[in-house]
Design a protein with these regions (language model features):
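N-terminal beta-alpha supersecondary unit
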Residues: 1-73, 284-285
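Conserved hydrophobic/aromatic positions in well-ordered beta-strands
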Residues: 4, 15-17, 146-150, 237
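Surface "functional belts" at beta-alpha junctions
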Residues: 23-29, 35, 41, 96-212, ...
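Residues at secondary-structure transition points
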Residues: 37-45, 76, 80, 84, ...
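Stable alpha-helical structural segments in soluble proteins, enriched in small hydrophobic residues
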Residues: 53-57, 92, 110-113, 215-227
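DPxDG-like acidic metal-binding loop motif
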Residues: 68-97, 102
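Acyltransferase
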Residues: 206-263, 268, 274-286
Length: 286
């Protein structure tokens, strides 16, 4: 089956992949992919990237079997761009649209590379326990991280907790026997706050401390999980309210400037009679 994947939780990326089965444990062959390192141009590039991966493979939307979108967590504007593009394409092509948490892409990359077998964390302790509890983090700005905890075994991984947002120094590693090595931490957010996470008991894997979620890794994670097991819920995981809100002080000044109830509007006020104020941006996409 052909799956078009999009993720805009950090950078903007699109990938077209052929998955050999919709059952768990499948593999994905990336046919074409594009990624922008610019974390602020998502709205401008997502649709063109989708068109380009199809053009590169000589296909069109009719050939696509499903659309996959990363659901975050991520900043409001960027994350919304990818999700809305995925929904629009799914609607236009009459194809199912699936959602998968974006941080899954990072743990997929590390797992596929054998990081948990080769790192000192896994070699010394990870596969001797039922699972290695692994932190995956991305940059939430404001000196915070978006993060989730995954349980990693020899056979795969699963979400153990999260996602959540908060300061890195408040993200404490699970308490293991003192003889155990520290639990691993991955992702760009881990690289930004290596010192704070190390002090909190994590072992930041340097080879994976630069990673952002990508559409290519996301679709590989979807194949491993099984497309038939994916959720059709594409609700965005913003985790905190949008910055694009009118300040409370400005709202108060606006309210105090309104004419008393029952007073007749004149001039410019008459032109706007009946218009409703724009609603504030929601904290979560419906």
């Amino acid at each position: 089956m052909l799956v078009l994947a999009l993720d805009s939780s950090a950078t903007a990326s699109v990938a077209l992949a052929r998955i050999d089965s919709d059952a768990p444990g499948a593999s994905a062959e990336i046919l074409a992919s594009y990624e922008s390192e610019d974390t602020r141009s998502h709205a401008e590039v997502m649709a063109p990237y989708a068109a380009q991966v199809l053009a590169d493979t000589g296909l069109d939307g009719a050939a696509v079997d499903a659309v996959l979108t990363g659901t975050g967590p991520g900043p409001f504007t960027g994350l919304r761009a990818g999700i809305m593009t995925a929904r629009t394409l799914g609607f236009a092509w009459n194809k199912p649209v699936y959602g998968l948490m974006s941080l899954t892409a990072i743990v997929e990359r590390a797992f596929a590379d054998g990081a948990f077998r080769d790192s000192r964390t896994a070699a010394n302790s990870g596969m001797n326990r039922a699972a290695v509890e692994t932190l995956v983090a991305s940059d939430a700005r404001r000196r915070e991280i978006y993060c989730a905890l995954f349980a990693v075994t020899e056979n795969g991984y699963s979400l153990a907790a999260g996602p959540s947002v908060g300061p890195a120094h408040q993200t404490h590693a699970p308490a293991y026997d003192p003889s155990d090595p520290a639990a691993p931490a991955l992702g760009y957010g881990a690289g930004l706050y290596t010192e704070a996470l190390t002090a909190s008991g994590w072992d930041v894997l340097k080879d994976y401390a630069h990673l952002h979620p990508t559409a290519a890794d996301l679709v590989k994670a979807a194949a491993r999980c099984g497309v038939k097991n994916l959720s059709r819920d594409t609700q965005a995981l913003y985790l905190r309210e949008s910055d694009a809100k009118v300040p409370a002080a400005m709202l108060a000044r606006t309210a105090s400037a309104q004419p008393p109830h029952g007073q007749q509007n004149t001039g410019e006020q008459q032109k706007t009679r009946g218009q409703q104020p724009a609603p504030a941006s929601p904290a979560r996409e419906q």
